[in-house]
Amino acid sequence: MWDSSMFLSTLTPKFYVALTGTSSLISGLILIFEWWYFRKYGTSFIEQVSINHISPWINGNDAQSDSSNGSGSSTSSGSSSSSNGGGGGGGGGAGGGGPGAGGGTNSTTTTGTQMPECKVWRNPLNLFRGAEYQRFFWATSKEPLTYYDMNLSAQDHQTFFTCEGDARKEEYEIMQTAWRERNPMQRIKSAHNALEINAECAPAYILLAEEEAMTIMEAEKILKTALKVAEINYRKSQATQHQGAIADGMHRRDTNVLIYIKRRLAMCARKLGKLKEAAKMFRDLTKEIPSIMSVLNIHENLIETLLEMQAYADCHAILAKYDDISLPKSATICYTAALLKARAVADKFSPDIASKRGLSPAEMSAVEAIHRAVEFNPHVPKYLLETKPLILPPEHILKRGDSEALAYAFFHLKHWKQVEGALNLLHCTWEGTFRMLPYPLERGHLFYPYPTCTECADRELLPAFHEVSVYPKKELPFFILFTAGLCSFTALLALLTHQYPEPMGLLAQTVLTWISYPFQLLKERVEAFWPCNLLQQLSRV
């Protein structure tokens, strides 16, 4: 028969050291995997497995059916929220800045009940690849754009500048391939080939202005040529648009090309300092109706140009039109509204005086506007206050995300600096927003709860050398901290026991004596209080 006492007596201290070291190694591996999973997905792997798999298995099939019913209702409520997105709570705050607004690209789907998805939008102020992004690459040897971002741009260009009527037209088929080409030199070569076949291929001029032109003046020159070609094509297709679906599609394509070229020309004028000309072109474009307008958000270009002109009254008029509860919000709208209200009080604002006498109605209105803007996008103040370095903005942004904050601050930081005291007011008040939002992922104040999908989408949009801003700041789960402590403690014990077996044995005996002493004392007290023959007396009763 197997004798356990004899087996235990044959075990040497090396066995216990090896056992402790093995458990420490396993704990360390679990810790490393858990930390990696948390950094990548923002949640504990063991916690997710426990909630999603182990708990339903322990609770039985009823719990599983309840869970599936609950997720079904969550999905339906999410769909309902999506269909009614612009109606309340600030007109759409989460991921896409309000569901139902056209032009967003679905990036990440979530299971939340408030906002079912995150939308990726075109950056209204996106830079020129050749004249701006390429020069940054030459200076730093760092890629300013990610393949994901450029792939979204290729999809946009194919949507805007192609149609069914392009079939069997060699120049347009070349351009369809050119938009998808990863090599910039090959894209430029394809555009030149398309122009050799047809000198009136406007999309080819657009690609050359975006990528081949090394200065803004060169880009403007190419775009002016493209504008003449686009106007000719537009008039031709306008005359034949009623001849069928294909002809109508060609007219829509030519309209998109014309509007895009005019917008880029206006942006060139803005960059070259021709502010009045740029403002007039942007105003004319905002009066257009085609569906591409909801994607380009040209009113944000107009707002930025008016701020550069310090035409604050005109900015108020633009905000009165677009800062509406039924329209999707953006950092430009929210922070421009805060800037204009701060402008009225910022030059005289003092935190010491305000703490003594309280805030005036105008100061209170400015502070509330700042809190509203910070709730919509909490990443912007770090860039405006220059506590975090700016990089070139991406071609696409995620509303309420770090990418939108970068795009806004990159172009609007100087406007905040132009208003005396505005940054000081922002510095003194912006963190007060978080006291009103103890659980931003669960409940918002003026907007939807902050979407959980922003971090993953921003990591796809922003280059690897940029540290993505995360909100709210995630704390390490208790399990990771516990595992780290247990792993370190057991590894230390194994090392000390291996090096100093006798002292560690005496230490272990002393610790066990200290731990057992309270229990021995409690046992003596109980025996002194209760008589030894208590059971006999109870049996007699």
UniProtKB/Swiss-Prot annotation:
Family label: Belongs to the ST7 family.
Region: Disordered, residue numbers: 62-116
Classification via CDD domains: ST7
Gene Ontology cellular component list: membrane
InterPro entries, A to Z: ST7
This protein's record includes keyword Transmembrane helix: yes
Keyword field: Membrane, Transmembrane, Transmembrane helix
Regions of compositional bias (Gly residues) in chain numbering: 84-105
Chief location bin: membrane
Composition bias, Low complexity: 67-83
Subcellular location as annotated: Membrane
Membrane topology (UniProt): Multi-pass membrane protein
Transmembrane segments: 15-35, 476-496
Origin species: Drosophila pseudoobscura pseudoobscura
Name listed for the protein in its UniProt record: Protein ST7 homolog
